[in-house]
Design a protein with these regions (language model features):
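Contiguous, function-dense segments enriched for cysteine-driven chemistry
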Residues: 1-14, 84-88, 93, 132
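Functionally constrained cores in energy, signaling, and assembly domains
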Residues: 33-34, 41, 106-108, 132, ...
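Noncatalytic regulatory segments and standalone regulatory/sensor domains
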Residues: 116-142
């Protein structure tokens, strides 16, 4: 299955937070996968960041630390699947909603379609042209 791409900011512009580029890929990916507002997702991650750092850090504006995003997702029923040695194009995400983790970036994939602000399906760092897939989060239904 070939992944397709659709540009999406996860509702950031609609939330009145502008369109400036910032390290907000985790916020955007979670907002899309959870089908909740960007502002609500950002507030939840900021609260967790503040709690986990004892107040030393207050905002995920310039990137969300991995322990914070991992806890946020696992607390909401997501399970991490590690995919060592595979590439994004090696996986079939048809009929699934996942948050894919590639080097230095996270993206939402809904039914085989990457929803992101840029076409993150491509990489110039690999021979196959697809980024390495470190793992992905998928919600487990109870």
């Amino acid at each position: 299955m070939t992944l397709t791409f659709k540009k999406s900011d996860g509702g950031k512009a609609d939330s009145g937070l502008g369109t400036a580029r910032s390290g907000d890929c985790v916020i955007r990916a979670i907002a899309i996968a959870e089908q909740q507002g960007y502002r609500k997702t950002k507030a939840g991650l900021n609260d967790l960041l503040h709690e986990m750092t004892g107040g030393l850090q207050r905002s995920c504006n310039d990137g969300t630390p991995l322990p914070v995003s991992h806890k946020y997702l696992t607390d909401r029923g997501y399970v991490l699947t590690l995919t060592k040695g595979t590439y994004l194009c090696d996986n079939d995400f048809t009929g699934r909603t996942v948050i894919a983790c590639i080097p230095r970036h996270n993206m939402a994939i809904v039914n085989g379609q990457v929803l992101d602000t840029w076409d993150s399906r491509k990489s110039r760092r690999t021979k196959c042209g697809s980024p390495k897939l470190e793992g992905f989060y998928e919600k487990v239904s109870n």
